[in-house]
Amino acid sequence: MLVLAHTGRESARRSARQVIERLTAAGIAVRVTDAEVPDLQCPGATVVPAGPEAAKGAELVIVLGGDGTLLRAAELARPAGTPLIGVNLGHVGFLAEAEPEGLSRTVDHLVAGEYRVEERMTLDVTARENGTEIVSTWALNEVTVEKAARERMVEVVIEVDGRPLSRWGCDGVVCATPTGSTAYAFSAGGPVVWPEVEALLIVPIAAHALFARPMVVSPRSVVAVELLHAAVGAHNQAGDGAGDGEPGAAEVERAVLWCDGRRRFDLPPGARVEVRRGALPVLLARVHGLASAPPGGGEFTDRLVAKFGLPVTGWRGRPAR
């Protein structure tokens, strides 16, 4: 098993050492990356390069940290087809399976092989300039096309399956998976989508338009975001004429592409970004609800209630059938 941790936190380093000691005591081979060895100081682990081969052949990747650490781990686990399991040492930690107080119990399940694996939909992303591919990447949570300058909007046209849908002057556009519906898309006003639902979400960010609502489309759809060439200063939000006499339209319509808030790519004016269902899913290991989870996404419902502190007082239970 490969163990990854947010080594900038003492709690994560301490938990990682605890996990490694318990796994090695159970006779399970453990890997850590060379980037984390100085911080973890675990002599019982095998050191591997912190690259795309780190998770190859591993049974699991155990991640100790927040959602950001798990997203980093997903970049290693996805190409290897290795499941991830997260222990939340961050804030919300929506992707994590366990909290710190349940760490020992979670490790016991893993040692005994008592876990199930879920597939989570991903996104494949390409960006082109004048028909030439300039970016090819992927995301687990979301892809965002955002303005590069705080004082300016971007002008975009949204296309779904080869047909134009709407033109927006906006701060950006989020294209998200169901897994990402509780992340940036949620903060931008998008709906929460249960992970069993197969869909793509399109969520505008602060759009100046009458029709600018979050939309849910087929998982087979291809969503395109095209950056338009607009007039100089056409979207000076301050309204003070600051756009007068400034450089050309390239500055006005320059934008950035973010994938999972981790990988950033500059987009030139006129760029086209296409988002579709990813060819490879991310695999998440689960130890909760192995036999007792109610049908219809009950485990996810409980996770929503716990993570967001939703009020459920007055619920009288499921009626007898």
Short names for language-model regions:
Residues V145, D161-P164, R213-R321:
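ATP/nucleoside-binding phosphotransfer catalytic cores, i.e., glycine-rich phosphate-binding loops
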Residues G8, D67-T69, V92, T179:
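Short glycine-rich anion-binding loops that position phosphate/pyrophosphate groups of nucleotides
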